[in-house]
Regions:
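Short acidic (Asp/Glu) and glycine-rich catalytic loops that position anionic groups and cofactors
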Residues: 30-32, 78, 82, 104, ...
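Flexible, glycine/threonine-enriched loop-and-boundary segments that flank and lead into catalytic domains
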Residues: 147-166
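Electropositive, glycine- and tryptophan-enriched low-complexity nucleic-acid-binding patches
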Residues: 160-208
Length: 250
């Protein structure tokens, strides 16, 4: 990714689409790179985990006492109906039953792991670990699992009225203040505070601009980065639109 960005910047500079002065003034901000996952309700996650374990057992010849192939989807539909009708006590009762079903399938497979060879056991282990996490996690827990196939997904709240929570990974973006050429993009796993990402983002931008012999000297940021200072870079907050550089003067 960084190599592609570096080639893009070098090409833009060689074509004189941007000059050195413009590349030295950047706007830095963070956003969420959303993952293409379904909304992670407890009922759906428990049912997906049960289906995955049953599929793995069938694929590797592990006989289960019961697969709950009929009861599992029925419980998932029932939980959805109760949630829609705002009958939350009934919904919680269904969720407890779904958690019990997942636990039974999980323990059944764990008891029979000795029947399979070491290679199969290692391939199944990662899915058993994730299913165990879904089985034990509760709504108030931290470091929750939001997608069985994508454990890197995090729940991030950015204060948006239309979307209170987004599911993905926090990323930082740096663009030139005049023409909006992307001169930096990187992920920040763990959802760190916005201000704690500024120095790392500018360090990446500085590395990408080495080939054109330019360093960022001005960083325009929002109030999430207030109080942060970076050596050799002037950090500007509360910048008026009129104070931004105009393209014809860059």
């Amino acid at each position: 990714m960084e190599e592609l960005l570096a080639h893009t910047i070098n090409a833009a500079h060689a074509m004189q689409a941007v000059d050195a002065r413009e590349l030295s003034r950047v706007i830095v901000d963070t956003t969420v790179q959303e993952k293409a996952i379904a909304y992670p309700t407890d009922s759906r996650l428990l049912e997906v985990a049960r289906k995955k374990l049953v599929l793995l057992a069938k694929r590797h010849g592990i006989g289960l006492r019961q697969s709950y192939a009929r009861q599992g989807p029925a419980l998932s539909r029932k939980a959805g109906r109760y949630a829609h009708a705002r009958q939350f006590k009934r919904m919680q009762r269904v969720l407890r039953r779904q958690r019990t079903v997942l636990g039974r399938v999980l323990r059944d497979i764990q008891r029979k792991l000795d029947q399979v060879n070491t290679g199969v056991r290692e391939r199944i282990a990662i899915w058993l670990e994730r299913a165990q996490q879904l089985y034990t996690q509760r709504p108030k827990d931290k470091q929750k699992l939001y997608a069985l196939h994508a454990p890197e997904v995090e729940c991030i709240g950015k204060g948006k009225a239309r979307q209170a929570y987004e599911f993905g990974v926090k990323v930082g973006i740096a663009v030139t203040a005049c023409k909006g050429l992307v001169v930096g993009a990187r992920s920040f796993p763990g959802n760190p505070y916005d201000g704690d990402t500024l120095a790392e983002q500018l360090e990446q931008t500085r590395g990408l601009l080495q080939d054109v012999s330019v360093e960022p000297t001005v960083a325009i940021v929002d109030l999430g980065d207030r109080g942060r200072e970076v050596d050799g870079v002037q950090v500007l907050h509360r910048v008026s639109v009129l104070a931004l550089p105009r393209c014809r003067t860059c």
